[in-house]
Amino acid sequence: INHGLHRIHVVDLDGAKASSPQNLDTLRTLAAVEGVEIEWGGGIKTEQALADVFAAGASYAVVGSVAAQRPERFEAWLQKYGADRMVLGADVKQGRVSVNGWQEEVDLTIDQLIDRFLPYGLSQVICTDVSRDGMLQGPATDLYVRLQKKYPTVDITVSGGISCMDDIISLQSLGLRKVIVGKAIYEGRIALKDLQVNELTRGQVNG
């Protein structure tokens, strides 16, 4: 917050494994910090789980596996809770969407997944290139640029591979609007003060 970052992306890994949110107390603690918006994902498989996440203070809910495997459920959530609060989480592996912690692939491309929900107002997508996540080898730039050009009304958030400020500056110059930065911060490759002055990352950091 001291560096101007107000949107924190958090993945409940325990929740993803258990198929239901497991760290709501942590969410409540984070959400209680003034000036912070929490973007929370992991284990949101039912409407009760979604309601619990919002009740615990999340500003945004990231839904991945359900959107790919039970699309009618995600459509209903977009309509009930609003596209401004619902984020489509799409993990991509070799061109196909992966679900359930990257353990399974479904017969869908990222484009098909986005197309399914556009009529319901979808406006936020976090796309993670599984092969690059946590590798610090640079993002799959071509993928993100193509998606952002194809879907100008959707904010395509870059996730995976960010290794340095040059990666972020390059993405910004190519028209990308949002990026999640995690491991590069933890390992000291990117300083929070540098993110503060960059428009692409202002307001969003991975937690």
Model-derived regions, located:
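Charged helix-capping and loop-helix junction motifs
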Residues: 21-28, 103-112, 137-146
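Conserved, mostly hydrophobic/aromatic
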Residues: 8, 53, 88, 125, ...
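C-terminal helical cap(s) of enzyme catalytic domains, especially alpha/beta-barrels
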Residues: 72-81, 172-207
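Short, acidic/polar
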Residues: 1, 45-51, 106-116
